[in-house]
From Swiss-Prot:
Keyword Cell cycle: no
Alphabetical list of PANTHER family matching this protein: FNIP REPEAT-CONTAINING PROTEIN
Name the record gives this protein: Putative FNIP repeat-containing protein R636
UniProt cross-references to InterPro entries, sorted A to Z: FNIP, LRR_dom_sf, STK_FNIP-Repeat
Keyword tags: Repeat
Superkingdom of the organism of origin: Viruses
Amino acid sequence: MIDHFIMNKLPLELVYYLTNWLKDYDKRMLLSTCKNFLSLQSCVYYEDIYYYEEIHKLSYHQMFRKVELELCKFKTPIPKIVTNLEFDVYFNEPLINRRIKIRNKWVKIRKIIPSTVKYLDMGYSFNKSIRGALSYGLTTLIFGPEFNQPIDNYIPQTVTYLEFSVYFDQPVVGYLPTRLTHLIFGTDFNQPIKGALPDTLEYLYFGWAFNQPIDFALPPNLKCLKFGHCFDQPIKGFLPLGLEKLIFEAEYHQPMDLAIPESVEYLKLGNPGSNSLENCLPINLKTLVFGENFNENLNTLSLDKFRELEKIEFDGFFDQKISSRITIDNVIKSNNFIETFQNFYGMIKYYFNDFINPNRQYLPENVKHIIISTYLYDKICSNISNDVFIEVYN
């Protein structure tokens, strides 16, 4: 049992210091051990996510950094100490000039979102103007699928992470924050980007519909670049020389020979079209992923010169024999193999839909791990060696 006399003798400075190392629940337990400690409640921050209705009547409600506020009860001010704010799936209310209740009086305030907020997730349904609603100091801004409003110069320059979702398709040239490091566009975005992207940008993801020219449009510090299913614009001479990760989600029909910088270590190809695959690959490549549309014969592919290559992954419906010439010691994730393959350690998942004949060597002896569905488990488990670990998913 705690000796309350001894606890009361502890310096408050020491107790305050100890709370920095405790989880929220333990903080509350410690501060409730004696009356003397209760004075620290208004000095200690709480980091977990709390429902607004649970904490707004507490005398120290301003010490909760992360508050979840239900739309139907959005009638009182959001605490000005909140740093992380996420709206729920139904929220679609104006962010400025809103009437709220303060001390039993209805008043009109210009901004709903406190200037203390650093992380803001607008939720699924939000699709209102953001003009004048966001404060300087915001660093992370995430819009949900329904948002498709002009951004003009409404996003603070302090934002470093910006994410748009499904329906956003508005002009961005001249409107993006100059400190951005991460920029994600959703499914429908297909606007010009030349002159739009800041030099600080390191991660850039385009969605399904994007198919705009990228000539001299990409910033020099870009490290990761992802193109969606519709992209089919020239890239030769336009990719940053320091690029490390490049993703094509679908077929690409533009010339690729020597177009990808040697700095690229991770490359995903949906389908290189008429391009020579061997001439597409950068010399320092470590991971090569073939996308869902790739089903080309690899018998002519020589990987001897790619000495850094560690991993090959087939991410779709690949269904070809793999030549014994490809003998690198790596991991291959193959989704749809029906043919035999040799000299590889690998995993089979998702679309495999064939019986494994126990009288025929379908799997190399060094395969140790297979991922299959519950549906297939009963079909094939009895024909697989007991040395192979079988992981089952629904």
